[in-house]
């Protein structure tokens, strides 16, 4: 009986469906123990040892797989990490395009910022003096609401909430003379 048990243990150790075989072996053992109570305690302990080593081995394999998955994901760039965190925080980011025609339209633009929407503002339909006032109001509101206001064109600005990162390189405008006539950048001296 001991040889048969040893062979079953070896076969079940290498079997693909180890969980069900160990359960079957565990169910059979109490019956055998009841029949042969005269066996010394050392022989009863030996069959249990392979069962104890199998589950930690599975856990070791699972932890190796998890480590491999973690190592594969390590060389992500910052943009990929930012995209992942942004996807967790917000499901969708929308960009509203606004063409303000009067100063009162600035309040509507700020309300969109409060709702965490990006706003592309084009001041082409406003006079320069009104556009400066409107831009001052929007810039102040963006500071209070921890937003970001960036110039993206000669008369266009991008207003974004704090959870949106915009990476804009220097944009060379094809109409260089247009920028000089319609430039209301507040940081100019």
Curated annotation (Swiss-Prot):
Residues 22-35 have a biased composition (Basic and acidic residues). Keywords: Cell cycle, Cell division, Cytoplasm, Septation. It is found in: Cytoplasm. Its main location: cytoplasm. GO terms for biological process: division septum assembly; FtsZ-dependent cytokinesis. Pfam families: SepF. The keyword Cell division applies. Homodimer. Interacts with FtsZ. HAMAP family: SepF (MF_01197). Cell division protein that is part of the divisome complex and is recruited early to the Z-ring. Probably stimulates Z-ring formation, perhaps through the cross-linking of FtsZ protofilaments. Its function overlaps with FtsA. This is Cell division protein SepF.
